[in-house]
Amino acid sequence: GENTFYGRVIHEAIHEFVNKVKSGARGLGPEKRIKLLLGPVGSGKSDFDRQIRRYYEDYTRRDEGRMYTFRWTNLCDVIPDQDPADDVVRSPMNQDPVVLLPQEQRDSVIEDINEILEAPYTIRNEQALDPASEFYMDKLLAHYDDDLQSVLENHIEIVRLLADENKRQAIETFEPKDKKNQDETELTGDVNYSKIAIYGESDPRAFDYSGAFCNANRGIFSGEELLKLQREFLYDFLHATQEQTIKPKNNPRIDIDQVIVGRTNMPEYRDKKGDEKMEAFNDRTKRIDFPYVLSYENEALIYRKMLRNADLPDIQVEPHTLEMAGLFGVLTRIEEPDQSSIDLVQKAKAYNGEIDESDDVDVKKLREEAATKVEIGEGMTGVSPRFIGDEIAEAIMDSMHRSRSFLSPLTTFNHLENNLENHGSIPEDMFETYYRYLELVREEYKERAIEDVRHALAYDLDEIQRQGEKYMDHVMAYIDDDTVEDEITGREQEPDEQFLRSVEEKLELPEDRKDDFRQEVANWVSRRAREGETFDPQDNDRLRRALERKLWEDKKHNINFSALV
């Protein structure tokens, strides 16, 4: 769908975030921490954060996600100086109605609720009423001689609470209005000057609970570019996380209950991490890494999604165009391997899942090796999908301008190459390296294009099937130290080593690796036989490619290329 995230590393990040929220719901500690989404620009942090908020909005509109709050009513009937405009007052912090009960009664009610719900976590609530609600409760209890039931029956209405970012209700996205002059009232609320003349400055009714933490109560606080805030301003987050309280101006501490999410990029993270004065803040954050995609086919899916959502006329994207653009992106994000037996492109292919049983490539070891070289992990640096997506868009417009109805890999490569140095986020000292990576991608594309031509010209299903069966007959005889029947004479003979090697050499398998490959395909055939499936070389990518290349070598001298042109 349109809200899909691509790539193993991104799904690991999402899984980690969900686990932290779940453990927080069980009171295991993460509820007292900021969930800090850390990643390079364009890695999907903001999109993920936005989708969390949209999901929460949707969830509170469903039966299983129902939330309730309360409002005070008929206040002017009891409180003489109550402003008629404030006869009905909604809970300014959208608190749960259960906080209206004294703790002993509340605990009994919550115990009954937990038994009925049979939820995988236990509901708890030890919060105090916010100052304004506490004021109303005290006044009303005094009027009714401490009869709480009369207060609840005559002055409380229970209302549904729907999370709504546009209304700043149970969801708040925070970005300071002025990054040079940040005011804590943006977080915790401020005096309502229009009410001071009515109630007086120290009256809790004259306070405006419109701070970001107030609006986010019972929901999600999302801090945009959180670590760009001034150090002093971030101190407000210390109590908001560890103690789950806020301290507005001229007010006592107020209890809050919300998931606090922050987003930041690498430069700000390094700056704050190295600041000794930020030690307390850093201790209250749980970092969740949001790196770039490291599988080039998953990267290509991002570009396909972009094109699918664009207002474009029918334009044919040639084979390998988006995959090779994705490969370039991945090459800029991964570390050069230490193994002499594997190069950077092969490592990218391994990360893409293009390895076989006989390949001497340990993907887990490659990841661990890279982790020792970089500060956090692979994918935290490199070219962003935004840059590549922009260049694909430019290449499309260039093709349309030239009256071409297709987008080719070569046009895309040219746009990437011509605009590398114009992109502000790419360090100058990486230009030459990235140009080299583009050349590697061009070579990879050339090999794939040649392979496509071979496949098209040598494509003969019957012959590939026949050659595949012959290869497997000789392989099984080789493994079992047996003989095979000669196709012409019918006599038993030794396996044809020359024929076997003529197939295997098309995959550039050295002599010392042939046994591994033969055992691999033999295991594959045996596994399919047990599952009741017939042998078809088309279902084994490496065997198919080897047979196609051999067939190409056998037939290419008989192809009339002039006639094809």
Task: Please identify what each model-predicted range represents.
Residues 1-565:
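Conserved ASCE/P-loop NTPase catalytic core
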